[in-house]
Regions:
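Surface-exposed, charge/polar-rich loops and edge strands
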Residues: 6-165
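Extracellular interaction modules
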Residues: 1-5
Length: 165
């Protein structure tokens, strides 16, 4: 999302995410980035007392969150803030980039996504999720004439690596 684009987070959605904890599947890379950005908003609440909805979640902001801060903690903190302030929604925007630089997945457990162009930031996100297996996955797709980009074929990516949730 660009800094001009915004997402609206409903309290009911945060409650549902907690209820389905550990089984959250994001459909599309925008959904991945939106969901993972919740951790940054919650961390702002812990640090600053407010999610500062007027400030976009910065490109590398998620990398500044301590490894010990879990996704469940983040959602609980966000929900408590919304309840305390009688908020039905939060509006925020994100500029995050998820790259294979030691990113700790906090919310998303599986991803449904298209096959992305080489050297794209979306492929970085896929690589951050599945690690070096992205080569094997994309080689298979190329050898079997999968369609790439928005109207192409999709994949279900499930990562069994340790989860910071």
């Amino acid at each position: 999302l660009s800094s001009a684009a915004s997402d609206v987070y409903k309290r009911q959605t945060v409650e549902r995410l907690l209820h389905r904890w550990g089984h959250i599947v994001a459909v599309g890379t925008t959904s991945v980035r939106t969901l993972e950005s919740l951790a940054a908003l919650a961390w702002r609440i812990r640090r600053e007392g407010s999610p500062d909805e007027m400030r976009a979640v910065g490109q590398w902001e998620l990398y500044d969150i301590p490894a010990s801060y879990t996704g469940r903690e983040a959602l609980e903190e966000l929900l408590a803030y919304m309840e305390r302030n009688d908020l039905g929604t939060l509006k925020a925007s994100t500029q995050i980039m998820i790259a294979p630089l030691g990113y700790r997945w906090r919310i998303v457990r599986a991803i449904v996504t298209n096959f992305h162009q080489p050297k794209s930031t979306l492929l970085l996100l896929v690589s951050a999720y599945v690690g070096e297996d992205w080569h094997r996955i994309y080689d298979y797709a190329l050898r079997n004439d999968f369609r790439f980009l928005s109207y192409g074929d999709s994949s279900l990516l499930v990562n069994d690596a340790p989860f910071a949730g």
